[in-house]
Amino acid sequence: MDNRGLRLFIVEGKELKGSDNGGSSSDPYVKLKFNGNSFKTETIKNTLSPVWNQSFDIGIINVNDPNAIIEVECLDWDRFGKHDSLGKVQLPIAILREAATFGQTDKWLNLDKKGYVRVGFQFNPPYPLQQHISPDGNPNIIQNQIQQQNLISSNGQLPPPVYYEPIYLKTHPTVLEAEFILPNDLYQKTIYVTGEPVRASLVLYVNQPIVVRSLFVSLKGKTSVCGKKQKELIQDLRNLLHTSIGPSSPNSQNQKVALDIGKHIYPFEFFIPKHCNSSIDGVGNYKVLYRFQFNADIVNLPDIQLEREITVVNIEDTVHRMTQSQIHEKCSKSPLTGGTIEMTITAPKNSYYPGEDIELQVHVNNSSKKKVKKIELELQRTISIQHEKGVPTQVLKVSKNFFPKIQQNQQSTQIVVMETPQTLLNSIYQSGIIKIEYKVRAVLDILDCIDLYTIFPVNIVLPDPKRVILPNPLDELSKIPRYIQDWTPRNLLSWLYFRMNCPEVVTSNPEFYQYCLSGNELLSIPDTILLEKVLKGAGTRTTEIHNAIKIEIDRVLSVRTILKDNQLPHLIQTFENELVTFDLLSSLSSIDLSHLTSTIGDRIRLQNAFEKLKLNN
């Protein structure tokens, strides 16, 4: 049992339902119910966007109790009569507990009727933040930065920059080039979350010794309308040579650094403030774009410039934002011929992510003389940019016939599923800038009568940005080349995940992604790097995984060694083009050798070498 004190803050509301003056305003207040106790805020008059900023001590709570739920209801105050409900929502303590472990202190709650209420929360004792490990294995570097995140929202400043030591691998690149390496982007797009560190690496492949004056990487984010920048969200810069020349050097800006042939890896880290918007591209003329930019000033060689767009998600736009609010929509009509037709639509929640099915239960009760033929459901989207009110457009439409038709004094219940597309835009509200909202229009087709319909809102939210979806193992294994030299970084990842069944190599080692090793690079890097850096996440299986990789490597290097020992290095490329590995040498026939080389002397040398190999085995 984990008992903690909980203090709840009712901060503000937005887009609330209008209950007064023809729906243009309300006098809202919030009422909380928990364990038989009630709490109530002050009433804010004539507004749909109230600011309360009131706090309540909820008491000592068992945070592991799945039945611990706070009822949050927003009501419209009236001098006379009953106070109208503007909407309510169930707030499980478990949601607050999970959010607190990630450093969140507030959430927007979606009311079941219309609008949102923002609540803050504080546990006592507080939850420790989940520890973040830096690429050098030191958790303190990142933890110090997390402790300074509160400075961002209060004074607009970013926390102090964090620098990491560069990594050098003595490989043999063929061209001078650079690329950005993002965590976990081999299987799916990397998604960064606002309010958290943004980590990546810049890899510089050097094919000849060079001297660099500067290596700078920057993170920029902005919103734009009609191609014109409207707001700058973030702009930050890192000098990747900072650690190479020493941060305390008085002339660090003017010093040059020599880089040898090989793969130079520069891990870097930025921080995106919690209030920044989610990435948006292609919503009318409105865009929110984030990108990494890199510039290398190289002596006596052309500069290298590189940029890469990244995807950023504000946690408020994801499934973590919304508590589960039920759909319960009821409407009815009375035909002129008498009786009543009632339709009730229910669902356990009103928030869905793109690609998720919207499953609705439709119940029809017919006490009239009319016949009910079918139900039609239409998902509508309205996009309003700046102060231009958008027009609802149809996103998808489904219909379901009632067999048989619903006659007088009959009722029927049907499950209707709306399959949302994977590319569906999420609901957005940014005051005065953009608003994307969704509604479901349900129409009951009644024979010889005006149709009965109702409209109710739903939210489209982004899925969990940290969800990892692995590809099909059989597909991945079938794509791994027999020859390790031809492996891509993705092939190595699939080999570890699915052939060796050891995902811990990746999931338990935050610096694994930085190396982004191809098979050709595996042939040249030292064993110490493999054991102590790349494979250390395997734990007790490190030696086993290392030996398995060495077997794959030896199948290639042993062939090269034999050819070199017999003064036949010119045949190395031919053998590798034909995928001849060490385990196949003893099986090569004289016909095979004649295909590999047309020189009689070379064939005889090869035959003699292979005979010795058979005798030694």
From Swiss-Prot:
Domain of life, per the record?
Eukaryota
Cofactors (names) = Ca(2+)
Boundaries of each C2 domain copy? 1-109
Which positions in this protein are listed as binding Ca(2+) 1? D20, D27, D76, D78
Which GO cellular component terms, listed alphabetically, does the Swiss-Prot or TrEMBL entry include? cytoplasm; cytosol
Q: Which SUPFAM superfamilies match?
A: C2 domain (Calcium/lipid-binding domain, CaLB), E set domains
Q: Kindly indicate whether the keyword Metal-binding belongs to this entry.
A: yes
**What GO terms are given for molecular function?**
cAMP-dependent protein kinase regulator activity; identical protein binding; metal ion binding; phosphatidylcholine binding; phosphatidylserine binding
List the keywords (alphabetical): Calcium, Metal-binding
Cited Gene3D superfamilies? 2.60.40.640, C2 domain, Transcription Factor, Ets-1
User: What positions does the entry give for Ca(2+) 2 binding?
Assistant: D20, D76, D78, D84
Q: Which GO terms describe its biological process?
A: aggregation involved in sorocarp development; biological process involved in interaction with symbiont; G protein-coupled receptor internalization; polyphosphate-mediated signaling; protein transport; regulation of adenylate cyclase-activating G protein-coupled receptor signaling pathway
PANTHER family membership: ARRESTIN DOMAIN CONTAINING PROTEIN, ARRESTIN DOMAIN-CONTAINING PROTEIN B
The entry's family comment says: Belongs to the arrestin family.
Name of the featured protein: Arrestin domain-containing protein B
Name the gene that codes for it.
adcB
